[in-house]
Regions:
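Positively charged, low-complexity terminal tracts
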Residues: 1-171
Length: 171
């Protein structure tokens, strides 16, 4: 594993984008200026579904061992910023424009952090494409965002692929 990937990246926020064939998760760092996208991971819808399941399992194990994650402190913003506003404030380095493709994910946790290894499983050797660390307080919100994005993706794109907008086998 390249040293750059092995060290991992701590992130303070996430943005999930989707298209018919893939999801893009941008991991943000907003502690120091310039605010920036610190990692971009490209996943298939199936891999995002597996990510949601694995994250839920890890959150359940975390809750069993340590109790529920503490809530993120601070005021709730009056409104969510638009995608355009986010990317006006967070610099996207040129080397991250294409992102890192992954077709599996490994998740683990400690009492204070979760980690995600996004893995590219190609012959002859699988490799970690990105390693992300998240504070435990962010996990419930991130999991909700993933699940919400999956539902929106299904409503937006899967109906288009079905003949006459009907579910297969119902007509």
């Amino acid at each position: 594993m390249p040293e750059k990937v092995a060290k991992g990246i701590m992130c303070t926020g996430q943005v999930i984008l989707d298209s018919p064939k893939e999801f893009v998760i941008d991991f943000l760092q907003g502690l120091t200026r310039p605010y920036q996208v610190v990692s971009r991971v490209v996943l298939t819808p199936q891999t995002v579904n597996e990510l949601a399941e694995a994250m839920q399992q890890n959150l359940d194990m975390y809750t069993k061992n340590y109790g529920p994650p503490p809530p993120v402190p601070g005021p709730v913003p009056d409104r969510r910023p638009t995608i355009q506003e986010i990317y006006e404030n967070f610099r996207l380095p040129e080397e991250l424009l294409s992102g890192s493709y992954a077709n599996s994910v490994l998740i683990g946790h400690s009492p204070t952090e979760f980690f995600m290894d996004f893995i590219t499983g190609f012959y002859p050797t699988s490799a970690v494409a990105a390693r992300i660390f998240l504070p435990v307080q962010q996990i419930p919100r991130f999991l909700n965002a993933i699940n919400s994005s999956l539902k929106q993706h299904q409503m937006r794109y899967q109906r288009r692929n079905e003949p006459n907008g009907e579910n297969p086998g119902t007509g």
